[in-house]
Regions:
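Acidic, low-complexity proline/glycine-rich segments
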Residues: 3-26, 41-51, 107-108
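Carboxylate-rich helix-loop segments that flank metal/cofactor sites and access channels
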Residues: 15-26, 89-133, 195-206
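Conserved catalytic-core motifs characterized by acidic clusters
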Residues: 21-34, 55, 60, 189-193
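Alpha-helical scaffold segments that form or flank carboxylate-/histidine-based iron centers
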Residues: 35-46, 66-86, 128-135, 160-172
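Acidic/histidine-rich alpha-helical segments that form the ligand environment
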Residues: 39-60, 108-161
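Preference for long, well-ordered alpha-helical segments
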Residues: 53, 135-215
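Conserved alpha-helical segments that form or flank metal/cofactor-binding pockets of metalloenzymes
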Residues: 67-110, 182
Length: 215
């Protein structure tokens, strides 16, 4: 009776035993859990995408037909491998709902594949310019994915994931520009190998033109 009378007389709603306070605590817990699940879904999506990309880069390296551009592909493969390890570490440490990264990735794979098979199904033998074009497409997809993850983590107050996503975004932002500048040279090289008379200076000229467009 005394507890009921205190509420009736306007007890402080912020006090630990007040029903309103309990309601707020429960609501905050639910919101926090939903936020964690939202971030976790982005993390597993990016992990699935990185895995597909890494397999593609490995396939191109094994194929060994890209010659002087192999160093670019190896750098991409190294970045992807590093990203996978970092995403695995944070996902396994948090273990959403008792579910580790291996199980979560199974559910994320179909979602990521829906983003566009052409962007990530790169394990095939293609001519060099098309390989680099598809690499560029995949890395660009990963870049915007990390931008979304960084923004989501910032908005929901997850500093750890925010910083991780930003670090990976920086890696791929540089890689995108490296690929962008490699494509003209790859096209000119390919045309020369096909027997066309080409101006070897064109690649450098195109890159300078493109730099003006971007910057």
């Amino acid at each position: 009776m005394m507890l009921r009378d205190n509420y009736a007389q306007g007890a402080d709603p912020s006090s630990p035993g007040h029903p309103a306070r309990a309601t707020h605590v429960i609501r905050d817990l639910i919101v926090s859990q939903n936020a964690q699940e939202t971030i976790a879904s982005y993390v597993t999506d990016m992990r699935a995408l990185e895995e597909h990309m890494h397999k593609a880069f490995a396939g191109q390296i094994t194929d060994g037909k890209d010659g002087k551009f192999n160093s670019v592909i190896r750098e991409l493969s190294g970045l992807s491998e590093k990203h996978i390890a970092a995403l695995d570490e944070i996902a396994d440490r948090r273990k959403q709902g008792g579910q580790g990264i291996a199980e979560a990735i199974k559910g994320a794979a179909s979602s990521v594949l829906g983003l566009g098979a052409a962007a990530i199904d790169l394990v095939r033998s293609e001519k060099l310019p098309k390989n680099l074009r598809d690499d560029y497409t995949a890395v660009s997809l990963a870049t915007v994915g990390y931008l979304m993850l960084h923004t989501t983590a910032e908005a929901l107050g997850d500093a750890e994931v925010s910083e991780l996503a930003l670090s990976h975004l920086r890696d791929y932002a540089k890689a995108v520009m490296t690929l962008f500048h490699a494509v003209p040279e790859a096209v000119v090289t390919f045309l020369g190998e096909e027997g066309f008379a080409v101006d070897s200076k064109v690649a450098s000229k195109v890159n300078k033109t493109v730099d003006k467009v971007w910057y």
